[in-house]
Amino acid sequence: MNAPHKTGTGRRAIPAAVDIDALIRAEHRDPFSILGPHGDGGSGQYVRAYLPAALSVRLLAKDDGRELGEMEMSEVPGFFVGHLEQPQPYLLKVQWAGGEQITEDPYSFGPLLGEMDLYLFAEGNHRDLSSCLGAQVTKVDGVDGVRFAVWAPNARRVSVVGSFNSWDGRRHPMRLRHPTGVWEIFVPRLQPGEVYKYEILGAHGILPLKSDPMALATTLPPDTASKVSAPLQFEWNDQEWLRSRTGRHDVAAPLSIYELHAGSWQMEQHEDGQWRQYNWRELADRLIPYVKELGFTHIELMPIMEHPFGGSWGYQLLAQFAPTARYGSPEDFAAFVDACHRAEIGVILDWVPAHFPTDTHGLAQFDGTALYEYADPKEGFHQDWNTLIYNLGRTEVHGFMLASALHWLKHYHIDGLRVDAVASMLYRDYSRNAGEWVPNRFGGRENIETIDFLRHLNDVVALEAPGTMVIAEESTAWPGVSEPTQQGGLGFNYKWNMGWMHDSLQYMMRDPLHRRHHHSTLTFGLVYAWSERFVLPISHDEVVHGKHSLIDKMPGDRWQKFANLRAYLSFMWTHPGKKLLFMGCEFGQWREWNHDEQLDWYLMQYADHVGVKNLVGDLNRLYRQEKALHQRDADPAGFQWLIGDDQANSVFAYLRWSNDGEPLLVVANMTPVPRLAYRVGAPVSGAWTELLNSDAETYAGSNMGNGGEVNTEDEPAHGMEASLKLNLPPLAVLILKPKKD
């Protein structure tokens, strides 16, 4: 080991002043060209390190730790240079004011990411990006540490900063990999749990510290740092569920979804009156038995990806790959999903590829330019939510969102994604006036980049995560949302039926006296019920912002409100389409949903609230047991009107048919007037069993009905040779089935 010197070749131990100056000012675009080991022009090598605030640096032999000599500090404080007679692996022994550190030199490692990884990323088709970019706990050349990689093609310099380097951007400037614009560095000996951000020098100067778009874990909000997370280490026990879920998600299978917000479903109250949210494991212990008791097949979680503002309910998120720290660690979330699967409950996540918030630590102007968003506000700013719109026409952003979807489906065994705000993605003029939007390349209003992305997403998910579902929240009449991409559709498995939801709620909110004038509002949904594969959604959006809770939408006095609610839920469960119900609706919570408070569980001491809960449980069990209620959802022949035109009495009657030709008869009386001896045609003669009566005493109804069984009469009605004479309870639905011998 010698002091720095000039070799006979003229190579300088100290780099050019312009390079040193750029390094000191943290503006050097290629720190690896200066720092680390470099040949001296002969048989030896120089070792350079820039360690601001270091008191001294010594070189140690990598193999046995023997001291090779002290590096000399140059005229520039913190810039150290040493010389080795022969190239050899070495360690840096750094003396700081607060202690000593021994580590490998981050600038002694060559390029990290493989060319194929970079190619697939640039192409927008990397299927496992969450194991490539971001902070990856890994081993390089036998050394444990963390590899950081971030996409910032227009940055002049990117550094990773954290408590491990005193948040000093001069300590770990990264290597730029041309031409993809990915910056990378390996920090030896760094451990999981370290917090970090990226310090980025843009074209116009230093930007606010940025969180990692590819972070696998984060700190607890309101903190905004990313957290180094080891690859998910969880022993899954859900293999039986995974093998069976393809059949469970088939259009002919029962699909009944309980939508919830993880933080406000149920909480623990401390003695001081403060509320504490449950973590994932605690929530599993309480939620799973409840969902199992009610008979739902799946739960749907409002977005659980990390989001800075809790009041956004998760829909304004910034970490597309990290579960929020509010409810525990990534392993805790995996344990929650695994517990659901072992209880035969599927897990669907709300997923938001449409837009993201403008927080300065997030994706906005990430490298000093509109990187993830459109540059033109007419394309890139969402006026309804004051958010930015993903530029899915950019291949890297396309691939980023595609990888996010696959990350949840594959790494966390998620069973389906509900894609939020699809309508806002499909139309360039969504919620915009004339002159406020940019036409596509053909002059139209369709967002061609989004259409391409959604089709690619659904094709890739079907290939990479078979048996999972992708469900669209799409509120317009866009054709073919759930049609295969090969047939020109978008390729979703299901689409939310927003039209049915709006029409049916409008009907139910009317005074029963006036329903006769709006009879077709309730029947209209059957005109287009088979145009898509539909989910009937009563979601969180319908019980907030002054819309009233589901039961409080219903007209009448207290008894009538409950009767209307029971009738509505029974109508929903017997209507073609899969089911989704938001938490609290299943027992008739009076309050609108508030994300800061738990549901009003105290209401379960009242019989009428318990009655609604009992009804939902029985509807789910009937829905799963009776093939006629789910098997032919996508087949118009599985539904048959008997009475759709009795406006005067506001009575509806229809049949649901199974593949085996077994019928169920549904009769609904949507007025508070009992209809005695009301005749309904029957396709099968003999005794019919009353499977469910929403007015039954067990549901806190008046208990009017038909004694559990009724026989047909040989009097033709409604195109049938036989008929049933039924007593129709007030504001109630009956479900009947032919009695088997």
UniProtKB/Swiss-Prot annotation:
Residues the record marks as active site: 420, 473
Enzyme nomenclature, EC number: 2.4.1.18
GO process annotations (BP): glycogen biosynthetic process
A single cellular component GO annotation: cytosol
Molecular function per GO: 1,4-alpha-glucan branching enzyme activity; cation binding; hydrolase activity, hydrolyzing O-glycosyl compounds
Subunit structure: Monomer.
UniProt record similarity statement: Belongs to the glycosyl hydrolase 13 family. GlgB subfamily.
Entry protein name: 1,4-alpha-glucan branching enzyme GlgB
Species in which this protein is naturally found: Pseudomonas savastanoi pv. phaseolicola (strain 1448A / Race 6) (Pseudomonas syringae pv. phaseolicola (strain 1448A / Race 6))
